[in-house]
Amino acid sequence: MYHYISDEHVPNMSESCQCTGSEFKRSINYFKNNGYTFVSLDKALKIIHNKLQQKFVVITFDDIPDCVYTNAYPILKQLNIPFTIYITYNFIDKESFITKEHLLKLKSDPLCTIGAHTMNHPMLRHCKNSLYEIQQCKIALEGLTGCNVEHFAYPYGQLAVVSKSNINMVKAVGYKTGVSAIGAPLTSESTKNLFFLPRIIINGISY
């Protein structure tokens, strides 16, 4: 799980969300050199369901800043690595976030899966309009891109800010999965609940 990929440090952003271009490359090389296969989230779930003995990694980005398009995407494209981007809809075209033009280019690449990350990035447990945030993001992204948006990422991704009701909403409105920021690998045990899957945050100090 990545957020911000840039050599430009952002003072008011958590260090856990920041990764330079060279650090991103180093993390990718770590997985390559240690026998991991890069797969889509859908492929990962099939591997687990079929109990295949395969080391794999799923690359995901949240929010997403435009530097993911300019700095991370060329590396992923060159290496033919699938990835998922979880879009906060009302961040599109905002300063430093992905532009509509770049999003539409990404949606045309079969390596890219587009997922939803709410309309405005609220703490869902404390949000009165949580159903709207969850459902409308799916509707809006499908309308903009023409893609089926089947995967969801919870803003902040911790149990303290995601309720059981929120998790049920994600299932009810038609998503196939919901991902958290709970730091654990995807295993047969951790994927029993497809609507609160774990992810491991990767940043500049991870490798």
Where in this protein do the model-derived segments appear?
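Structural detector of well-ordered beta-strand residues that form the stable sheet scaffold
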Residues: 84-86, 113-115, 176-179
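Short active-site segment of divalent metal-dependent hydrolases/proteases
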Residues: 65-66, 120
